[in-house]
Amino acid sequence: MVRAKRTKRDSATNIYRTCKQAGTCPPDVINKVEQSTIADNILKYGSAGVFFGGLGISTGRGTGGTTGYVPLGEGTGVRVGSTPTVVRPALVPEVIGPADLLPVDTIAPVDPASSSIVPLTESSGVDLLPGEIETIAEVHPIPDVPTFDTPVVTTSKGSSAILEVAPEPTPPTRVRVSRTQYHNPAFHIITESTPSQGESSLSDEIIVASGAGGQSVGVSENIELQDLSNRYSFEIETPTPPRRSSTPLQRATQAFRQRSLTNRRLLQQVPVEDPLFLTQPSKLVRFAFENPAFEEEVTQVFEQDLAGFVEPPNRDFLDIAELGRPRFSETREGYVRLSRLGRRATIRTRAGTQIGAQVHFYKDLSSINTEAPIELDLLGQHSGDATIVHGTVESTFIDTNIEENPLAEQMELEIDTYPEAHSFDALLDEATDDFSGSQLVIGNRRSTTSYTVPRFESPRNSSYYVQDLQGYYVAYPESRDKIELIYPSPTLPAVVIHTEDSSGDFYLHPSLLQRRRRKRKYL
C-alpha cells in the first residue's frame, strides 16, 4: 500500500478569503484570523480588569513610573524623560509670504447694442522708468534678559510642580603670578633671560655659584662616611653542583619530559647517526628538492600514496607520516640530546584511518673536550721602551773621489792572469728548441671529445685544508668501524629479523607459512 503524499495547506489568510462566503472555514482558521483564540481572549478580558500603564514596566524608558525616582527619606521625585518645553525667542518674527497684489485696470465688457467705433483719446507716453521705491529698515532691540543653562522639567500629570534650581555660573577667574626673591649671602644668583637658537619663547636661567662672603655659624659636624666597594669586588656564589645554564628549568618539568620520550612501552626508541637529522630531517624520509630558505623547526607531515610507494633514503624512517619539531634535553651522562617524535602510518583502512606506532628519534651530541695546548713562539719581543734612532747623528759618511779608483789597476791584472773568470760567454743563451716530439697539423682544429663524469652529492659537508709547510701541522686521525654484513646461505630459510627493532615484531617468509587444505564434503 502506497501512502499518499502530504501536501502543505495554504496560509490561513488565503483560506479565510475563499471559504468565508461558503461557510466551510475550519475553526482554527476562523479563530486565527478573527483573533478569537484562547490567548487572545485572555489578553482581552485580562486587560479590562488589570491596568499596568504608567509604571514603566518593560518600556525601556527609564522614567521610574508615575512617581519617578525618589531618593530614600525624601519626598516625591522628578520626572525624567518627559517632553521638554521649547523656549521661544523674545524677537517678533517676520511673516515670510508673497508680496502685496497690485490692482490691474480691467476693460469693461462691450455691449452688443453700443457703437463699434472707438473714440481716440490723447494720452501721454508710457513711463518706462521705475518710480521711487521706499526702503524701510526696522531694527528690533534685543532685550537684556539673562539666560541660564538650566534643565526644564515639565509634567503632564496633576502632581505638584518641582523646579530644580541650578547654581549661578561662576565668573572667570584671573590668575596673577608673582615672584619673590630672597637674598642669601652664601650664594650669588644670576638671573638671565636670553633667547637661545631654536627657541620660540624666553625662559629664565638661574645659575647658582658658591661665594666667599659667607659666615660659618656654629661648629661643623664630622659625619663618618662609608666607603663604597668597587663594582668588581662582589662575590659570586657558586651552587653545588654547578649550573650548566643561566636559567635552568625546573627539575620536575624536565624529568617529566624526559620520561615521556624514553618510555619504551609507548615509544619505539631509534638512534640516528646521520648528521642530516640535525638540520634537514626531511631528506631522511623522502627525496625532495632542497629549499635553503626553509628551516625545518616545525612539525612536518608527509603524505604518500600506496600506489606510488618509494623507498626512503634511510630505512629507520620507513612509513613515517609525521615528524615533530626538535626537542633538546640533557642525558644522565651530561650530553645534549636532540629528539624528534614521529608517527608511522603502517596500516591504512578503507575509511582512511591510519594506524601506526610512535617512534622517538634521537641523536646525542658529544661533549667538546679541551685539547692539549700548543706552545707558541713570541714574535717581535721587546722590552716596551721606545728607541729613537737619528740617522744623521749615528751614521758615518766618508768622502771619496770617484774619479780616482785605487782598485782599477788590480782588476786589470786579474783579467790578464785569469781571462776565463771574466768571460762574457756566460751571458749568451745556448738553449736550443727541440721539435722531435712535435706534430704538424694542417687544416682546421680537431674536434675535442667531451665526457660527462657524474658527480654524486654527499650528505656530509666537504672539508678542505691548506697545508702550511712553515708552521705546525696538527692531524686528528679518525677511524670508523665498518659493519660487516653476513648473508645467510641459500639452503637456510630466508627469515628477516630486525635486530634494531625493540618492539619484537618479525616478518616471516611466505614460503614457511602452512598451506591451507581444502575441505571437501562427501555426499
Curated annotation (Swiss-Prot):
<feature type="short sequence motif" description="Nuclear localization signal">
    <location>
        <begin position="1"/>
        <end position="10"/>
    </location>
</feature>
<protein>
    <recommendedName>
        <fullName>Minor capsid protein L2</fullName>
    </recommendedName>
</protein>
<keyword id="KW-0426">Late protein</keyword>
<dbReference type="GO" id="GO:0019028">
    <property type="term" value="C:viral capsid"/>
</dbReference>
<keyword id="KW-1040">Host Golgi apparatus</keyword>
<keyword id="KW-0945">Host-virus interaction</keyword>
<keyword id="KW-0238">DNA-binding</keyword>
<keyword id="KW-0597">Phosphoprotein</keyword>
<dbReference type="GO" id="GO:0003677">
    <property type="term" value="F:DNA binding"/>
</dbReference>
<dbReference type="GO" id="GO:0044177">
    <property type="term" value="C:host cell Golgi apparatus"/>
</dbReference>
<dbReference type="Pfam" id="PF00513">
    <property type="entry name" value="Late_protein_L2"/>
</dbReference>
<keyword id="KW-1163">Viral penetration into host nucleus</keyword>
<dbReference type="GO" id="GO:0005198">
    <property type="term" value="F:structural molecule activity"/>
</dbReference>
<comment type="subunit">
    <text>Interacts with major capsid protein L1. Interacts with E2; this interaction inhibits E2 transcriptional activity but not the DNA replication function E2. Interacts with host GADD45GIP1. Interacts with host HSPA8; this interaction is required for L2 nuclear translocation. Interacts with host importins KPNB2 and KPNB3. Forms a complex with importin alpha2-beta1 heterodimers via interaction with the importin alpha2 adapter. Interacts with host DYNLT1; this interaction is essential for virus intracellular transport during entry.</text>
</comment>
<keyword id="KW-1048">Host nucleus</keyword>
<keyword id="KW-1160">Virus entry into host cell</keyword>
<comment type="similarity">
    <text>Belongs to the papillomaviridae L2 protein family.</text>
</comment>
<keyword id="KW-1015">Disulfide bond</keyword>
<dbReference type="InterPro" id="IPR000784">
    <property type="entry name" value="Late_L2"/>
</dbReference>
<dbReference type="GO" id="GO:0042025">
    <property type="term" value="C:host cell nucleus"/>
</dbReference>
<dbReference type="GO" id="GO:0046718">
    <property type="term" value="P:symbiont entry into host cell"/>
</dbReference>
<keyword id="KW-1039">Host endosome</keyword>
<keyword id="KW-0167">Capsid protein</keyword>
<dbReference type="GO" id="GO:0044174">
    <property type="term" value="C:host cell endosome"/>
</dbReference>
<comment type="function">
    <text>Minor protein of the capsid that localizes along the inner surface of the virion, within the central cavities beneath the L1 pentamers. Plays a role in capsid stabilization through interaction with the major capsid protein L1. Once the virion enters the host cell, L2 escorts the genomic DNA into the nucleus by promoting escape from the endosomal compartments and traffic through the host Golgi network.</text>
</comment>
<keyword id="KW-1176">Cytoplasmic inwards viral transport</keyword>
<dbReference type="GO" id="GO:0075732">
    <property type="term" value="P:viral penetration into host nucleus"/>
</dbReference>
<dbReference type="GO" id="GO:0075521">
    <property type="term" value="P:microtubule-dependent intracellular transport of viral material towards nucleus"/>
</dbReference>
<feature type="disulfide bond">
    <location>
        <begin position="19"/>
        <end position="25"/>
    </location>
</feature>
<feature type="short sequence motif" description="Nuclear localization signal">
    <location>
        <begin position="514"/>
        <end position="522"/>
    </location>
</feature>
<dbReference type="GO" id="GO:0043657">
    <property type="term" value="C:host cell"/>
</dbReference>
<keyword id="KW-1177">Microtubular inwards viral transport</keyword>
<keyword id="KW-0946">Virion</keyword>
